[in-house]
Amino acid sequence: MRRLSSWRKMATAEKQKHDGRVKIGHYILGDTLGVGTFGKVKVGKHELTGHKVAVKILNRQKIRSLDVVGKIRREIQNLKLFRHPHIIKLYQVISTPSDIFMVMEYVSGGELFDYICKNGRLDEKESRRLFQQILSGVDYCHRHMVVHRDLKPENVLLDAHMNAKIADFGLSNMMSDGEFLRTSCGSPNYAAPEVISGRLYAGPEVDIWSSGVILYALLCGTLPFDDDHVPTLFKKICDGIFYTPQYLNPSVISLLKHMLQVDPMKRAAIKDIREHEWFKQDLPKYLFPEDPSYSSTMIDDEALKEVCEKFECSEEEVLSCLYNRNHQDPLAVAYHLIIDNRRIMNEAKDFYLATSPPDSFLDDHHLTRPHPERVPFLVAETPRARHTLDELNPQKSKHQGVRKAKWHLGIRSQSRPNDIMAEVCRAIKQLDYEWKVVNPYYLRVRRKNPVTSTFSKMSLQLYQVDSRTYLLDFRSIDDEITEAKSGTATPQRSGSISNYRSCQRSDSDAEAQGKPSDVSLTSSVTSLDSSPVDVAPRPGSHTIEFFEMCANLIKILAQ
């Protein structure tokens, strides 16, 4: 069965020292790249591949004080799906009791702000090229119901080839029809009049204003609204009057004035900008591929399956959102993201993935080669293009020397084994399942069907995969076999977890427990003791109930 790796609650990792440096997960943290509202951004180096990443450290206490803990969970899940050449990728999220570590794409060119400060204004052609890339990223976010709300040259990074990459979605949030944002955030010099005045705003229009300020900075090397005295700065912004140098093209001046309209209702939308004559010059086709037509009658099974895996939800939940045209629901957003990403890869031949350096264009090799950061323990996975049957066959390997993938029905975690089992017991108790402890790392669980009064049963076995990774395996069980192997044990229904103390197991211990090679599915129905119950066979239903038990448990653990 497919291994489920996005067990967010249990995907915690402790800080470790590595040659005097802090290590989080597989990443050795290095120098500080910058300091933001919630914490620092450090460069990280993957201990296995040697590739660099940027690690954004979000302090939990600061997040709690802003009351955004509940809001960012599904937003981060969708940001993992974002794949655009001009948006910084989010690879993985690692949690510790004190911090959240967001492992992101690293680019070497620094901030656009520093580049302008050092080199001054850019020529019109280069300004247009970068602005086209920035607006393409903003449009991608808006189409998938995310607003940035803090766009500025400091949040636009440059790669080694002088391509723009939008970063720092820390202040962004999902937008929905009829919902107005009240939060006043962002940097004053780039903030729209409705933001600094505290008025209600919908979201996309504030990104248009900020994009206009960035375009002005590219063309002029200065800001349209600037003053050391904050009240004076606010007055300039609310008046919307800015200086236009004589060297500016009249066409771009008209675009700037449309984007920097004080009245958000009169302000340019992305559609207006895309149709502007200045913007359309030398516009690469890949930046704005044709809009997808999302059909409520034609469902993409591959995308549907991927959403269910990433959000640990049922197909019915996703289909309900799609059929009801609830496009603002995170499940629907994720579904359309996956389709959008595939369409971009298929239609845009010069579209390259947002990796560093971005000189690898799409070809057959790059479509099948995994990203260097996509190692087995990463939480985030890139939405994949369609594969051949050979690629989907785990028995075949396209390249010699590549270790064959191992499939499990279970969850991997790098937490301590005692903590894993303690969390499992809490989840079982919350679901009102019954269980008994065979040993500290092996539980037998059953659930009573309220309709048939029969029991569905499974075992939970924790295995050690390597020196730091554990696999919680789900298995449908047959009591006659299990009791003969393990003997009887007193059923424990208490929520107490005092039994789980330091009792680490090695790989040899796992083998001694009779590690299964496959997930065993059985259609027999037996009682928790060794005596079978005479119940008429229910072909297929036992398997379905087993998977329902697994799904319910995983949902609780993922909260």
Swiss-Prot record:
Obligatory cofactor(s): Mg(2+)
Region AIS: start-end pairs: 302-381
Reaction(s) the record says it catalyses: L-seryl-[protein] + ATP = O-phospho-L-seryl-[protein] + ADP + H(+); L-threonyl-[protein] + ATP = O-phospho-L-threonyl-[protein] + ADP + H(+); L-seryl-[acetyl-CoA carboxylase] + ATP = O-phospho-L-seryl-[acetyl-CoA carboxylase] + ADP + H(+); L-seryl-[3-hydroxy-3-methylglutaryl-coenzyme A reductase] + ATP = O-phospho-L-seryl-[3-hydroxy-3-methylglutaryl-coenzyme A reductase] + ADP + H(+)
Residue numbers bearing the Phosphoserine modification: S356, S360, S397, S467, S486, S496, S508, S524, S527
A Pfam cross-reference name: AdenylateSensor
Composition bias, Low complexity: 516-535
Activity regulation, per record: Activated by phosphorylation on Thr-183. Binding of AMP to non-catalytic gamma subunit (PRKAG1, PRKAG2 or PRKAG3) results in allosteric activation, inducing phosphorylation on Thr-183. AMP-binding to gamma subunit also sustains activity by preventing dephosphorylation of Thr-183. ADP also stimulates Thr-183 phosphorylation, without stimulating already phosphorylated AMPK. ATP promotes dephosphorylation of Thr-183, rendering the enzyme inactive. Under physiological conditions AMPK mainly exists in its inactive form in complex with ATP, which is much more abundant than AMP.
Domain Protein kinase, first and last residues per copy: 27-279
Keywords: ATP-binding, Autophagy, Biological rhythms, Cholesterol biosynthesis, Cholesterol metabolism, Chromatin regulator, Cytoplasm, Fatty acid biosynthesis, Fatty acid metabolism, Glycoprotein, Kinase, Lipid biosynthesis, Lipid metabolism, Magnesium, Metal-binding, Nucleotide-binding, Nucleus, Phosphoprotein, Serine/threonine-protein kinase, Steroid biosynthesis, Steroid metabolism, Sterol biosynthesis, Sterol metabolism, Transcription, Transcription regulation, Transferase, Ubl conjugation, Wnt signaling pathway
PANTHER family given in the database record: ACETYL-COA CARBOXYLASE KINASE, MAP/MICROTUBULE AFFINITY-REGULATING KINASE
Function: Catalytic subunit of AMP-activated protein kinase (AMPK), an energy sensor protein kinase that plays a key role in regulating cellular energy metabolism. In response to reduction of intracellular ATP levels, AMPK activates energy-producing pathways and inhibits energy-consuming processes: inhibits protein, carbohydrate and lipid biosynthesis, as well as cell growth and proliferation. AMPK acts via direct phosphorylation of metabolic enzymes, and by longer-term effects via phosphorylation of transcription regulators.
Protein name: 5'-AMP-activated protein kinase catalytic subunit alpha-1
Organism: Mus musculus (Mouse)
Lineage: Eukaryota, Metazoa, Chordata, Craniata, Vertebrata
